[in-house]
Structure formats: structure tokens, C-alpha cells
Regions:
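Flexible glycine/proline-enriched surface loops and loop-helix/loop-strand junctions
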Residues: 112-115, 132-139
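Acidic/His- and Gly-rich active-site-bordering loop/insert found
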Residues: 1-34, 55-60, 241
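Acidic/histidine-rich catalytic neighborhood of metal-dependent amide-processing enzymes
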Residues: 33, 37-118
Length: 373
């Protein structure tokens, strides 16, 4: 799986790019431009790998379906969702599904020297809430002590200071189990004795944005709306809050959290209809996962493989019921700097890296189909 739509580039950032953002410029070592990591790289690499296999005369012993969406960044309702609907209508059951997702991290996992290939065995849920503060307005020359903007701001501060409870979910537990033995002595000891060090482990995760997202159902204020004129105190102020939910949390969990944390009757809470729960957790003790893990080790030498939780949303959420084995992994090696290019500035993929991505898909198809040309 993959998608060939991309997120836009803010006009104010265009001059900060090394090369034009949509040029696809190929320099000596990199392919530059929006989509070079998310996610045109997977689409083109899959097609190139299939073309190479066909040129070798490869004949798979089973069907291989390539599903490419055109609106993943908008939710996938007209792309992946439509494809998945057709597959269900045809009663197609896949042994496994592989979509974009986690990557091969280089120097990102604290205490781990070797590169780590992380396979997403589940992805977080998605929910959006709108907070509406309603307070009498008036003229700015005679302000009251409180108005809608102030009341809403106080609510947002409460959410910031009182996040949802952190926990080690099952996918993160699997990650700890596999990565723990590869860490330094202190970290290894902590991971091996979670009954004693669980709070410390969670605190360590909470120290970074990415780590915190692995152990917490996060919330982020993304939209604000209020006021129409500088000398008029508005009667209404609205904020949109986006949540990414750990397995086990749902829209009721979010509503209860908002109600109890804000505890202000002047704030109305409404939940968007586009809620999607965290996906089911795919197994790691089956041939499908082992095929992916084996292929990673064959192509990316000296790389540790571990399951984990996908903190962002992918098109996989639409494929419920088509396979119990749904995985999220993009075979690209990235350090912390390169990761910032995804949805950011100077998105690019190394040419050598891209060749390995093609090799990965080519090898995976052969491993999964039991037959080599």
C-alpha cells in the first residue's frame, strides 16, 4: 500500500527549501521534494520492484494486490476506503497488508546504538472535539472581568496542565520486550523490571514529543475562532482539539476527560463524527510478521527489528476485516534531522536509501510468495 497525494507547503516556507518543493530535483545524493518520504517514495518503489521482478520472469504463487490511495492526507475516504469496500464486496482476505508507517531509526531510540526498524502493529485512534465558550460580550471600552476568549483560554490551559493518563500499551510493551536486551545496562535493567520501574520508564518516554505520544492519548489545540472587530468583545469563542488515542481509549473517554478536566458549564463540548478508534493489534508470532522482519534483516544489515505503535493515522484504518495481519512500515533509514522533512521543510530521500527501498519490496514479495525467479 501507499498513497500519492501529499500535504501542501506553506507559501511562507518556500524560500527555505534547498530546491523547489515540488520539483522532484535529483542532486548528487538525494531526491528532493514533497512526497519523497511521504509517501510517493513507497508507491514508486513498489512499482519499480514489481517491474524488476517481471523483467526477471518472476511468477508469484499467490495474488499480490497493490493499493494506492489519492487522498490519504484528507482521510482516505475516496481512495483507501473505496478500495477496501471493493475488496470486501469480493470477499478477498489477505494474508497480510503492509502500508506506510514507522521507519528505520538511526540514533533516535535513546540508549540504542544500532539502527532500529520499527514495525507498526497498531495505530492510534483519532478524535476531534470542539470547545465553545459562550459569555456575554459588549464594548471593549467597558470590559468585564471575563469574556468568551478568556474562558476558553482558561479551559485550554487546564488541558495543557492535565493531560490524559499515560500508560504502556500492548504494542509499546512488545517494543520494550524486543528492544530492551539491546540497550545499555541501566536501561536494560529498568525494562526487565517494569513492576518496579514502570513510572520511571513512562517519565523517560514523556521527556520527548515522540516518546510521550507512544504512552499517552495526546491532545492538541489546532484551530481557534473568535471575534469580528478589535473594539467588540465577542460572545463566542471556539477551539478545535485533535486527539490521538491509545488502544482502549474512545470518544467517550475523550468527552469524560474534557468534561472533568475543564469543569466549567460555560464550555460546551461537541465531538466530531469522524472518530476512529485505535486499530486492532496485529500479531508478531506469525509468518506474515516474520516475512517482513526477515526481509528487513536481509536488506538492512545489522538492524534490530521490533514492533511498536504507529502514532499517526494511515490508510490502514479502512482495511478492517480484510486481514488480521496489518502492518505499518516504510523501509527508509532516517535520523532525527531527516524525520523533520516529513510534512516539513527540505523533505528528501537519499538515492542509496531509495535503492534499498526498492530492494526491500522486491525481496519481500519473493519471501511472501515462497518462490524466487
Amino acid at each position: 500500500m501507499g498513497h500519492y497525494d501529499v500535504v501542501p507547503v506553506e507559501e511562507a516556507s518556500l524560500k527555505q527549501w534547498e530546491y523547489p518543493a515540488f520539483s522532484g530535483f535529483i542532486s548528487e545524493k538525494f531526491i528532493h521534494g514533497r512526497g519523497s518520504l511521504d509517501d510517493k517514495v513507497a508507491v514508486i518503489a513498489i512499482l519499480e520492484s514489481v517491474e524488476k521482478l517481471l523483467n526477471k520472469g518472476f511468477e508469484p504463487e499467490r495474488s499480490i494486490i497493490m493499493a494506492f490511495g489519492h487522498d490519504e492526507e484528507l482521510g482516505g475516504n475516496k481512495g483507501a476506503k473505496a478500495i477496501a469496500t471493493i475488496l470486501r464486496e469480493r470477499n478477498i482476505q489477505a494474508e497480510f497488508i503492509l502500508d506506510e508507517g514507522l521507519v528505520i531509526t538511526d540514533g533516535i531510540v535513546p540508549g540504542l546504538k544500532a539502527p532500529a526498524a520499527l514495525i507498526g502493529i497498531a495505530e492510534k485512534g483519532y478524535a476531534t472535539a470542539t470547545l465553545t465558550a459562550k459569555v456575554d460580550g459588549g464594548h471593549s471600552s467597558m470590559p468585564k472581568k471575563e469574556n468568551a476568549i478568556v474562558v476558553l483560554s482558561e479551559a485550554l490551559v487546564k488541558l495543557k496542565n492535565n493531560p490524559m493518563p499515560s500508560q504502556i500499551s500492548e504494542p509499546v510493551q512488545f517494543f520494550i520486550n524486543d528492544i530492551g536486551p539491546e540497550l545499555s545496562f541501566v536501561n536494560k535493567m529498568a525494562f526487565a523490571n517494569q513492576w518496579l520501574f514502570e513510572k520511571l520508564i513512562i517519565q523517560k518516554y514523556q521527556a520527548t514529543n515522540t516518546g510521550n505520544a507512544l504512552v499517552t492519548s495526546t491532545s492538541a489545540a489546532t484551530l481557534l475562532q473568535s471575534g469580528m472587530k478589535e473594539n467588540v468583545i465577542p460572545m463566542i469563542a471556539k477551539a478545535t482539539i485533535n486527539f490521538r488515542l491509545l488502544p482502549g481509549d474512545d470518544d467517550k473517554t475523550v468527552r469524560d476527560y474534557l468534561k472533568n478536566t475543564i469543569a466549567d458549564d460555560r464550555i460546551e463540548i461537541s465531538m466530531s463524527k469522524d472518530f476512529s478508534p485505535a486499530t486492532s493489534i496485529s500479531p508478531t508470532n506469525n509468518k506474515a510478521y516474520q516475512d517482513i522482519s526477515k526481509t528487513i534483516k536481509e536488506v538492512f544489515h545489522n538492524t534490530i527489528v521490533a514492533p511498536s505503535l504507529m502514532i499517526a493515522a494511515t490508510d490502514q484504518k479502512h482495511y478492517t476485516g480484510i486481514s488480521e495481519n496489518r502492518y505499518r512500515f516504510l523501509p527508509v533509514q532516517l535520523n532525527a534531522t531527516a524525520l523533520k522533512g516529513i510534512h516539513g521543510i527540505n523533505e528528501k530521500v537519499g538515492i542509496d536509501n531509495y535503492q534499498l527501498i526498492i530492494q526491500f519490496y522486491e525481496q519481500l514479495i519473493q519471501n511472501a510468495c515462497f518462490k524466487t525467479p
